[in-house]
Amino acid sequence: MSIVMQLQDVAESTRLGPLSGEVRAGEILHLVGPNGAGKSTLLARMAGMTSGKGSIQFAGQPLEAWSATKLALHRAYLSQQQTPPFAMPVWHYLTLHQHDKTRTELLNDVAGALALDDKLGRSTNQLSGGEWQRVRLAAVVLQITPQANPAGQLLLLDEPMNSLDVAQQSALDKILSALCQQGLAIVMSSHDLNHTLRHAHRAWLLKGGKMLASGRREEVLTPPNLAQAYGMNFRRLDIEGHRMLISTI
């Protein structure tokens, strides 16, 4: 798999790093670790929203060399918290994120996959927290999907499962898996270790802005590594063919 993004000694104040790593096309990479580990800070830096020490190469070019317009064509970023910028119909908000605004069937398909069919005519300021989260997710998918944007390469998601129920999480997993199979690189933060153990290809385990471990999910999410990160004991079980992590008291 080709390298989409290369990080070298990336650091930001006292909150992050220095850390190094790479993001590959066609993979799902999870950032895991306790609150305050630096996951959101790292994602914002990878998205080009902040600057600091170290270097980031995106598609072979320094990240800071990308214009905002060009960057929006090649990467999409979902921040952890955002309120509706102003009131508008959901369908209009989603259309604003499409590079090809004639692809109404694609908009309907993505909205349907996230159970937003009956929300398209509603105003963004009349949505519940979970509905708004799904609208935001649909927007970044429409922005970056190779189906309508051949230049799309990278999707960055900060705790995308927030406010989603089990069925909605499963729907999002299917969408992300399909994007990954189309060659997109996906980086997302998560607090659900078992979700990471099941769905991530690789993981970076962070604590206090430092990377404790990186590699394949099975190699990173080990009881010793997790005990170091969270200060508590874990066991890894095999249940009906699925690996599962549990904490022990």
From Swiss-Prot:
Residue intervals of the ABC transporter domain: 1-233
Membrane topology: Peripheral membrane protein
Superkingdom: Bacteria
Keyword vocabulary terms for this entry: ATP-binding, Cell inner membrane, Cell membrane, Membrane, Nucleotide-binding, Translocase, Transport
Chain residues that bind ATP: G33, P34, N35, G36, A37, G38, K39, S40
PROSITE patterns: ABC_TRANSPORTER_1, ABC_TRANSPORTER_2
Compartments where found: Cell inner membrane
EC numbers: 7.6.2.8
Main subcellular location of this protein, as a coarse class: membrane
Keyword Calcium listed: no
A single cellular component GO annotation: plasma membrane
Reaction catalysed by this enzyme: an R-cob(III)alamin(out) + ATP + H2O = an R-cob(III)alamin(in) + ADP + phosphate + H(+)
Assembly: The complex is composed of two ATP-binding proteins (BtuD), two transmembrane proteins (BtuC) and a solute-binding protein (BtuF).
Record's function text: Part of the ABC transporter complex BtuCDF involved in vitamin B12 import. Responsible for energy coupling to the transport system.
PANTHER family membership: METAL TRANSPORT SYSTEM ATP-BINDING PROTEIN TM_0124-RELATED, VITAMIN B12 IMPORT ATP-BINDING PROTEIN BTUD
Name of the featured protein: Vitamin B12 import ATP-binding protein BtuD
